[in-house]
Amino acid sequence: MAIITMKSLLEAGVHFGHQVKRLDPRMKRFIFSERNEIHILDLQKTLQGIKDSYELVQRVIKDGKKVLFVGTKKQASEIIEQEARRSDMPYVNNRWLGGMLSNFNTIRKSVQKLKKLEKMEVDGTFDMISKKEISQLNREKFKLAKNLTGIKDMETLPGAIFIIDPKREQIAINEARKLKIPIISVVDTNCNPDVIDCPIPGNDDAIRSVALFTKIISDAILESDKEVGIQIIENLNEEDLMKEIEIKNDKSDSIEEGRSNL
């Protein structure tokens, strides 16, 4: 059973929003307070978002479907791949190609081409063609692999999509919404939560925060067949929470710097 505590969220810097001037007004309901011109997210609502997302993921997996992990920004790319692989799920961590969902059949043809090139490399075909042809095929394979490796085994559309940074992955969100694929996403204070089915208010820039959220989704997948849920321990009252926030603020030269260094 996954155990999530308020303190673990604080330690990962989940509560740090962006500068006040960057607020998307639709995120106001997720704001706890303001410190040094930086918004602090309401971790009670983060915990609720985690719980809702955990339950949705487990329903999707029990229905025999996949969860597609998406995160192409520098802070998320490696984490997305690691956690998707750990839970044997498809992922996109380099670039979202337009049509990955909305033009799925065409994308599958590109995937089949990639698989064919990979097979040619090991079945002896390359031994029967010129070095120039091999070079051309390798370039083509590299180009395809760069964007399609993570979805090679995704034979059908996913049952849900998990996204880090919805502002960056707007095309993916548009395609998922068009196809009515449920969207789970970490939403920072500069995001629009209204286009997300399961928004998780949180810092989508700090590596530790991104890693924590992605691990939670991966854990939900791995535990879906064990009939176990998620245990949330709210081990800080509001007064203690404020103290912890002040301590975290004092430890960094600025909160905005802390977003990426935590």
From Swiss-Prot:
Q: Spell out where the chain crosses the membrane.
A: none
This protein's source sits in the domain of life called Bacteria
Per its UniProt record, what InterPro entries does this chain match?
Ribosomal_uS2, Ribosomal_uS2_bac/mit/plastid, Ribosomal_uS2_CS, Ribosomal_uS2_flav_dom_sf
Q: What biological processes does GO assign it?
A: translation
Per UniProt, the keywords (alphabetical) are: Ribonucleoprotein, Ribosomal protein
Pfam families of this UniProt entry? Answer: Ribosomal_S2
**Does Ribosomal protein count among this protein's keywords?**
yes
Q: Which CDD domains match?
A: RPS2
Q: Which GO terms describe its cellular component?
A: cytosolic small ribosomal subunit
In terms of SUPFAM superfamilies, this protein maps to: Ribosomal protein S2 (SSF52313)
* One MF term in the entry's GO annotations: structural constituent of ribosome
Provide the disulphide bond pattern: none
User: What PANTHER family does the database record attribute to this sequence?
Assistant: 30S RIBOSOMAL PROTEIN S2 PROKARYOTIC AND ORGANELLAR, SMALL RIBOSOMAL SUBUNIT PROTEIN US2M
The entry's family comment says: Belongs to the universal ribosomal protein uS2 family.
Protein name, UniProt field:
Small ribosomal subunit protein uS2
Species per Swiss-Prot/TrEMBL record: Borrelia garinii subsp. bavariensis (strain ATCC BAA-2496 / DSM 23469 / PBi) (Borreliella bavariensis)
- What is the name of the gene encoding this protein? rpsB
